[in-house]
Amino acid sequence: LRAALIREVTLLLDDTPVVAARSVLPLTSLTGANRSLGHMGSRSLGLELYKRPTCQRDQVWARIGSPAEAMPVCWGRQSRFIKRGEPLLVAEYFLPALWEKVGATSVSSGLL
């Protein structure tokens, strides 16, 4: 069992929750140049992961599940990133409101 920082955020579109995300950052990954990842506050982790050449996604898994208790079952993806040689895990669940906003309700309801 390894100690980790857990970061949970909800992304909004027009003040409506559309993505629930959870990041797991092992404390051993939050040293040296990666230390800033442990102090992101409300800043976007995605900008840090996709903007920097020192980070790459090395594995992606599709998921069907609920991001939290009392939340609907929905599609998601889980990604493992390597940043400066250290791993971190990001799970994103695409809430039904996202599909409704983009006019693709069959994706959220027809496949589950």
Roles of regions detected by a PLM:
Residues 1-112:
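Composition-driven recognition of glycine/serine/threonine/acidic- and proline-rich low-complexity segments
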